[in-house]
A protein has these predicted regions:
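Conserved catalytic cores of very large enzyme subunits
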Residues: 2-211, 246-249, 253, 257-811
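Extended non-globular scaffold/tether segments
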Residues: 208, 212-224
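Heptad-repeat amphipathic alpha-helical coiled-coil interaction surface used
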Residues: 222, 229, 233-236, 244, ...
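Short amphipathic alpha-helical segments enriched in leucine
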Residues: 226, 230-233, 575, 808
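Acidic, metal/cofactor-coordinating or nucleic-acid-engaging core segments within structured domains
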Residues: 240
C-alpha cells in the first residue's frame, strides 16, 4: 500500500472494531440459493387460490414474515434478514421456477455470479415445481405475447429475462412519510377510505380488496418487527452487560418502528432497514433505492445530537452498519440475465447532496449528514449502497473536493448526477417543481421522485442498435440468426448514398421500437394482474388515495424508459460508412459487406478493418462529423418511443409515457455476444460500448473531448439516464494538481456542457490483470461495471476483460 493511499484511508477513518468484524464476516459468506421463501410462498398460494390477486399477495407476504427464519448477527446494531443466512438468495416461484430448475446443477459451475446450492434445497425446489408449472408470471406473460414478437424472444434480441423472472422495483418509497407517520398512519388512512367506499360503484370492489390487503401487510410488518424484538430480548438475557444493553435498545426500536413514527436516529435507521429488506422479500425486483437519505434522516440526527442522545461517531457506526446489512441482500438470476447484470448487483442507490427549495428558491442541500454518509461509504468500501451525489452549480466546493477524495479510493463511487439538466427535464415532462427538486437516483443512473414514482423507471428490452443496424443493412434479416426481424427497407450492397441507409435505419428502428413496446406492455399487464405488490404500492403516493396498486396507476408519476445498447458502435459505424464508402469511395458497399460477413478474417478484409478503425471519425473525440450522425440516428428512436403510452396512461399518474435511457448496465457484453461484426471494425461477438461511453480505446483526446461528444447527445430528452463511465489510473490522481484539474473538469462538464452523469473507475490495468491471475490477493477489489459497482472476482471473465479494455484516461 502506498503512503498516499494510507493517508487517504486515514483521512476517512477506520470502521469500528465491531463493524470491521461484521464486514469481514459478510464478505466471508458463500452465497447459496435459499429455498425457504419458495416453500412458504407455495404454502400460502396453495391455501389462497380463490383470493383476489392483491389479497393473495398480501397473505403470502404475511405468511412468509410470520414463518421465515429470523436472526440477529452478533456484531449488528440493526436487525432484519432476507433469507436463512446472510448473502443467500431466496427463490420467487410466483415469478418463475423455470431457470432455477434448469440450472440446479449449474449454479456452482458458472463462469461468474456463482451460487452454491445444497441437495436439500434442490429437493425443496423440485417438490414445489408441479404447483407452479404454467402457474406463474413468466407463463402468463409469455401467453400474452403475440406471435409477431416471438422471434425477438427466441433470438434473444429483447433481453426480457429481468422482467419475466422477477419483480419490478426500480423505485424508492416514501421513507420520509413512513418515518413521520409510521405504518399506523397508512393503516388509518386505508381504514378510513375503505369505510367511505360506495360499493355500488364497480371500481369500489377492487379498491376495497386493495385496502384490506394493505391492512394485512401492515399488520404482518408489525408482527415481523415484533419477532426481532422478542429475539433481541431473549439474546439480551444471555449476553454480557454491554451487548445486553444494545440488544434491549434494539428490542425497544423493533417494538416501535416501522409501525409507529420514529423518535430517534437509531429508530429511523432501523425503520428504513426494515422497509428495505421486507420490500425485497415481497418481490424479487432490484434497484430498490434509499432515496435522499441525508435529507429525511437529518431531523433525527440533529435532534439526537442536540439532546445528547447520540454522538457523530455513533451515528457514523449506524450508517456503516446499514451499508453492511445492505450487502447481505442477494438475488439469483438466470445465466442469461447475468449477462446484463454481472456481479450479482442489487443497485440499492442512496442519493446525497443536490438542492432543496426554501420559500420557493433552490438552496444547496448538502448538510452534516451528507458528509457523514460520504464518510461512512468511504469506510465500508462495499458494492452497496450505490452512492450518487447530486451536483449543482452552487454545490459546496469542499464537499465536491471530498467526493473526489472518495473517488480516489478506487471503488467506483460516488457517481455524479447533474441537477442543472435533470430538474428542468423533469419539469418539462410535467413533474411539479417541488417534486423535481426532490428527485433521487434509482438503481444505476435512472432518476425518479422518491415515494411518488411508479415501478421500473427503466424498460428491459435492451434495443441493440448495432445489431439492428446490421439487420437494416441486410434487408430486415438478422445477421446473427438469419431470422427476419423487420420489413425489407433496402439492402446495403444496393445503396448508392448515405441518405438511403439513414432512411432504412429510421424505418427499422421505428418498427423495432413498436415491437419492444408490445413486449413490455404484455409483461406489464401480466405483472399487474398476477403479482401486485401491496406493501410497495402502499408506500408509494398516491396508491392508497386512489385505491390502486402501482401497476394499476396508483403512483403520482409514471414514466418508463427503454434501454439502448451500443450507441458508440452505432456512431462509429455510421461515420465509417458515410466517410469511407459514400464520400471517399475507398470501400465499396459490397466490399464492406463481404468484410463484415467474413468477420474481417482474410488479409484483404483485415486491411478494410484497419481502415474502419483508423481512418474514420470516432465518437468520444469531440468530432462533430460523427457526433452529429449519432444524434440524427438516435433521434429516430427518441421520437418514436415517445409516441407509445404505457399500461398506466390515463389511469391516474402524470405521464404514463416513455422516454429514452442509456443505462445498459453490463448488457453490452451479453448483447455483444449476439452481434456479428460491425462497420466500425469491431469483430463478431466482442462487447459493445456501454452506456453512452465511447467504444474502447477509440477516445484518443482525453476526457474533455469525451465530455464534449457525450453532451452533444439530446440529454434533455434522455431522461432515463445518460450513463458515462471513465477510467483513470490511481497514480494520476496522487498529484494534487491533477485532483484540482479533475474537479475543474467536472465543473466544466456539468456547468458549461450540461452533462447528465459521470462516474470513475480509479484503478490501474496492472491491478486488474493481477486480480485475474491471483484473485485470492484481491478479495475486496471493486470496479465500476456500468451504473453500479461489483466485486471484480465475481464477474465473468468476459466482463472482466471488458473492464480491462476500457480507455485509461490521463488528465
Amino acid at each position: 500500500m502506498t503512503s498516499q493511499r494510507q493517508s487517504l484511508l486515514d483521512h476517512f477513518g477506520e470502521l469500528t472494531p465491531r463493524m470491521r468484524r461484521f464486514r469481514e464476516a459478510v464478505l466471508d459468506e458463500r452465497p447459496y440459493v435459499d429455498g425457504e421463501r419458495a416453500v412458504l410462498c407455495t404454502e400460502s398460494y396453495e391455501q389462497t387460490r380463490a383470493q383476489p390477486p392483491a389479497m393473495r399477495r398480501a397473505l403470502m407476504l404475511s405468511h412468509i414474515l410470520d414463518a421465515m427464519t429470523v436472526y440477529i448477527e452478533p456484531e449488528t446494531l440493526i436487525c432484519g434478514n432476507q433469507a436463512t443466512k446472510n448473502c443467500n438468495a431466496p427463490v420467487f416461484p410466483e415469478y418463475t421456477l423455470g431457470f432455477v430448475l434448469d440450472e440446479l446443477d449449474l449454479f456452482e459451475k458458472r463462469d461468474g455470479d456463482v451460487f452454491h446450492i445444497t441437495e436439500e434445497t434442490k429437493e425443496q425446489i423440485r417438490s414445489i415445481a408441479p404447483f407452479w408449472e404454467g402457474n406463474n408470471l413468466r407463463a402468463r406473460g409469455e401467453a400474452l405475447l403475440p406471435e409477431e414478437v416471438s422471434v425477438f424472444m427466441e433470438t434473444g434480441l429483447f433481453g426480457m429475462e429481468g422482467k419475466l423472472n422477477a419483480g419490478d422495483a426500480h423505485l424508492a418509497v416514501n421513507h420520509r412519510r413512513v418515518l413521520a407517520e409510521g405504518l399506523r398512519g397508512y393503516e388509518e388512512r386505508a381504514r378510513r377510505l375503505s369505510a367511505g367506499l360506495d360499493l355500488t360503484d364497480p371500481a369500489s370492489i377492487d379498491k376495497r380488496v386493495f385496502y384490506n390487503a394493505v391492512l394485512e401487510v401492515v399488520a404482518a410488518v408489525r408482527r415481523f418487527a415484533g419477532r426481532y424484538a422478542e429475539l433481541a430480548r431473549a439474546q439480551a438475557a444471555e449476553a454480557d452487560p454491554a451487548r445486553a444493553a444494545e440488544l434491549l435498545a434494539m428490542a425497544e426500536a423493533c417494538e416501535r418502528v416501522p409501525y409507529e413514527p420514529a423518535r430517534t436516529f437509531r429508530e429511523a435507521v432501523q425503520a428504513v432497514w426494515f422497509l428495505q429488506v421486507i420490500l425485497q422479500i415481497e418481490s424479487n425486483g432490484h434497484s430498490l433505492s434509499y432515496g435522499r437519505l441525508d435529507q429525511y434522516l437529518l431531523p433525527f440526527y440533529e435532534a439526537d445530537l442536540a439532546a445528547g442522545r447520540i454522538t457523530e461517531d455513533e451515528a457514523l457506526e449506524l450508517l456503516t452498519n446499514l451499508w453492511i446489512k445492505s450487502l447481505t441482500v442477494n438475488k439469483v438470476r438466470s445465466q442469461a440475465h447475468t449477462l446484463s447484470s454481472a456481479g450479482s448487483p442489487m443497485y440499492q442507490n442512496v442519493t446525497i447532496g443536490g438542492q432543496r427549495l426554501v420559500d420557493g428558491m433552490p438552496q444547496d442541500a448538502v448538510n452534516p449528514l451528507s458528509w457523514l454518509v460520504l464518510r461512512s461509504v468511504a469506510q465500508t468500501r462495499l458494492t452497496q449502497p450505490n452512492l450518487t451525489v447530486r451536483y449543482h452549480a452552487s454545490i459546496d466546493p469542499a464537499f465536491l473536493d471530498e467526493c473526489v477524495e472518495v473517488m480516489r479510493l478506487g471503488f467506483g463511487m460516488p457517481a455524479m448526477n447533474n441537477d442543472e439538466v435533470i430538474i428542468p427535464s423533469f419539469i418539462d415532462w410535467g413533474v411539479a417543481r417541488e417534486d423535481a427538486y426532490d428527485y433521487s437516483a434509482i438503481g444505476c443512473v435512472e432518476t425518479a421522485v422518491p415515494g411518488k414514482w411508479g415501478y421500473r423507471c427503466t424498460g428491459m428490452s435492451y434495443l441493440n442498435f448495432p445489431r439492428l443496424l446490421l439487420c437494416c443493412m441486410n434487408g430486415g434479416v438478422d445477421l446473427t440468426t438469419g431470422r427476419r426481424f423487420t420489413e425489407d427497407h433496402g439492402r446495403f450492397t444496393e445503396m448508392t448514398s448515405y441518405d438511403e441507409l439513414l432512411d432504412a435505419w429510421d424505418k427499422t428502428i421505428r418498427e423495432m421500437c413498436r415491437y419492444s413496446v408490445i413486449v413490455e406492455n404484455a409483461i406489464d399487464l401480466a405483472s399487474e394482474r398476477d403479482v401486485p405488490d401491496v406493501l410497495c404500492s402502499a408506500l408509494t403516493d398516491d396508491c392508497i388515495g386512489r385505491g390502486k396498486t402501482i401497476k394499476e396507476g396508483g403512483a403520482v408519476y409514471d414514466f418508463i424508459s427503454g434501454l439502448q445498447v451500443g450507441i458508440a458502435n452505432m456512431a462509429d459505424s455510421l461515420a465509417a460508412v458515410k466517410k469511407l464508402v459514400f464520400e471517399e469511395g475507398r470501400i465499396t458497399p459490397q466490399q464492406l459487406w463481404d468484410a463484415i460477413l467474413d468477420d474481417f478474417q482474410s488479409p484483404e478484409n483485415q486491411r478494410i478493418q484497419r481502415m474502419l478503425q483508423q481512418d474514420a471519425p470516432k465518437y468520444g473525440n469531440d468530432d462533430d462529423y460523427v457526433d452529429r450522425l449519432v444524434v440524427e440516428a438516435y433521434d429516430s428512436y427518441i421520437d418514436e418511443v415517445a409516441k407509445y403510452p404505457s399500461t398506466r396512461h390515463g389511469r391516474g399518474p402524470v405521464g404514463g409515457i416513455r422516454y429514452a435511457g442509456t443505462s445498459s448496465i453490463s448488457a453490452n457484453v451479453g448483447q455483444g455476444m449476439g452481434t456479428m461484426a460491425t462497420p466500425d471494425g469491431r469483430n463478431a461477438r466482442e462487447p459493445l460500448a456501454e452506456g453512452c461511453s465511447p467504444a474502447h480505446n477509440r477516445d484518443l483526446h482525453g476526457p474533455t473531448a469525451v465530455f464534449k461528444s457525450v453532451t452533444k447527445l439530446p440529454t434533455e430528452k434522455i431522461t432515463g439516464g445518460v450513463l458515462l463511465n471513465q477510467k483513470v489510473n490511481p497514480s494520476t490522481l496522487e498529484r494534487p494538481e491533477n485532483k484540482i484539474k479533475l474537479e475543474s473538469m467536472l465543473r466544466a462538464y456539468f456547468n458549461r456542457l450540461h452533462g447528465y452523469h459521470v462516474q470513475f473507475n480509479v484503478v490501474s490495468r496492472e491491478t486488474l490483470l493481477d486480480a485475474q491471475e491471483h484473485p485470492e490477493n484481491h478479495r475486496d477489489l471493486i470496479v465500476r461495471v456500468a451504473g453500479y459497482s461489483a466485486f471484480f472476482n465475481v464477474l465473468s471473465r468476459a466482463t472482466q476483460d471488458d473492464i480491462i479494455a476500457r480507455t485509461e484516461q490521463t488528465l
